[in-house]
């Protein structure tokens, strides 16, 4: 109550921010008349003036009002488009490490030119990041004339470019590209073997379009560069044949009754669990097929890999649905993004799940991969000196942007008032009733000439609606992952009179739906159109536009609520752009995923009490509130999972930064001779300490062991025992010096043989290759540690603290191994000439060519397990004495109930 009163008196934080920025907009507007009088050359010369001022000590904030005024004037001359005041506000927000929420159609692309130009003046590089190659190319080509008019260069960074093309793109003042490509280039640069192979400059300023999609929806998706591991496709195929024999549990276990079945599904957590009966059945099936020894358990240590394959196959069959979670195209399983409805070629689920889905669908099973380098988008983007983003829907996730990335969200007002009508949800009992009402609504819109955009949550649902419309003879276009090639064309004409477009989630995001259709695309389709043709197209469009506005504008029709309110708002935001007329409504049924899992009991009870009949819908604020609360619960849970992922990845990120920094130092150094000498001394002293303990008597020395180790691991034959027998004055310290001296002389003789420059180059190549190999093994060990760390909760230990402690120990071991392995190779290898080093480089390049780029979804289940385990750490452990009691045996307490439903619950 007091909060509302204070907001009324002093305005919200957002209002105060906009008010202070509004004063700067007034300054920019005051410059407009003067800048209009400048010639083109005088306007262009402003860029070099600004750069000189920055070099002489002025800041970007000092030149910002003038720079923004210059961009506005240049845009008027190049594009015949003037930045609105609200776009100036958006530009200032983006320059100040914040997120600008700007409604669809408010000109985010043009707004981005302001901070991109300002930060491009520094010469350090600006990265404008979009969600796909099409948008990156489109925005770069559209804005190139403006930036080049002002003397700034523009680059495009998309997949498939050569090394020099990438370098040129990154050396431009402003580089457009996709989040994946920038991330992969960062990883590749940190796997390079010479400075010439690196393409990126230091990460300076990132401006992210559709920031919610990249920093939130993609946050659980690490970028992974991987190489092929062992082939286990046959095992996946065999395990796949077992799953159809298993039956889903008919109901959940209760105290009174145990549900019949082999596995249970937790839809909220998207997890599947085998029951005791299911485990026994799988063991019998595996034994029959000769994959498990008679009497052996699936849960024994030796069968962990088998259990992993069974769990992956069970998840593939029960939790992942064709045409919802993935599609099969060209004998390949392609993931469908649950947030955008787009396909994601090249992206694979981790932990064997993708191979299990391939086995289920009977397509070619690709090998599992071994991680060579990985990073999450969260940690990649936090490396930029300046980070900003823009989207139409950020306010619902403002807390997460602030908490994870330190980015405040500012809601930018629309240039014209928003007049879209958002109708209350209509809730039906069954999907059939819901779809019948949707078809009826569409027919009503077509009669009025009102265009309709139907938003669905899956490909399956979009195809079902398409079939229903075909039956009713309603002309329509379908926009889903299967038809993404025509995406821009379909979206461009979705605003025509009476048009009906079905779109999965937010496919087509980034392209505006213009009422009456997109006349620009009609002109672009003509080759060398005349002025008369252009005028006619525009006049025809104006008539259609007025007809659509009179019919009520674009009508948004949602067929199901998404887990996130933000995705629903994105769908609604397609209508009502730039003050246009429009409307929206969601149609729901009690069998929709969100309703069934979260909101079902309350709303179903209410509907039954109201005595609803078939075809009747409920429309009430209470229902909308219950649905919104359900969405909030899911959003909170997903935020916790992303936060957990980040906390674990932060540990790996600290180590990644150390390794990459050391790697770059090695690569940039002309010679690493001093480093090798220091490592040699460390290795020798450590080795001697193992066999000749300090300040110990000679009887405790293991001289034969030391001689053998030196010969086997380092190729050095030293007659240490002979020295001791013939030279009575040798003691521990002098012996240590003799060993080091002999080692150094042996190494110097190599240098004399092949030449100093060749050996220096070879040292660097060995050091880098050894570091890469050990880092790869370390990443695999970290993955292994991560997957089972939540089980530490059962031992009353905090999994996060245990992960930090053990990962640090693994890292220390890796650094020790690095020293020993490098010295071992340098001591044993005989370098003949420069050609040996070149051959080593060539082999490494051939290996690089086999490397794959993967994006793998982090398994949320492991993180959920970690949360549960932390809670367990607070409980006292139960120690069993005597014989183990089976879960289905009678409880020893004498109650007559099964042990798992009585005292077994406590364990």
From Swiss-Prot:
One Pfam family from the record: SecA_PP_bind
Biased composition (Basic and acidic residues): 878-887
EC number: 7.4.2.8
Reported cofactor(s): Zn(2+)
InterPro entries: Helicase_ATP-bd, Helicase_C-like, P-loop_NTPase, SEC_C_motif, SecA, SecA_CS, SecA_DEAD, SecA_motor_DEAD
Basic residues composition-biased segments: 897-907
Membrane topology of this protein: Peripheral membrane protein
One GO CC annotation: cell envelope Sec protein transport complex
Binding site for Zn(2+): 891, 893, 902-903
Subunit structure: Monomer and homodimer. Part of the essential Sec protein translocation apparatus which comprises SecA, SecYEG and auxiliary proteins SecDF-YajC and YidC.
Protein name as annotated: Protein translocase subunit SecA
Naturally occurring in which organism (per UniProt): Shewanella woodyi (strain ATCC 51908 / MS32)
Gene, per the UniProt record: secA
